[in-house]
């Protein structure tokens, strides 16, 4: 409960929990301007797939326009000093979330990409400035992003999302 309640109060990366009050109060935000700058660094084919499926950046999913009409992507997370804790963003929504979770052709949403880019980007560039990501639990869903499953290239989803950020997963 010590972690579930505060994460839920911040929206828990779930539209059902991200009430207008939670969205407006959330301090962790990625401006549309910063997100577009990050998005512009993606491999062209990967970026085009995201736009085709989710629309132009910053999208509408988890976007708050109460402070900035251009939009800010809200990241439901808890930050304490040099540690940040968040629920992994969803890959998508629909009637069959398990199929969406494991869909190797579904590109990540703008919100999904923004969360990882915020984690990895330097603080002076609007990010958290992490040195690594640690996934806890059964497994994450990065490995299900479009692209190869071994010998990843910059055009593969997991590499495009994480960039140079090391990922420590459950062994």
Cite the ranges covered by each PLM segment.
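Catalytic or ion-translocation cores adjacent to nucleophile or general acid/base/metal-coordination motifs
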Residues: 1-21, 84-88, 95-123, 127-133, ...
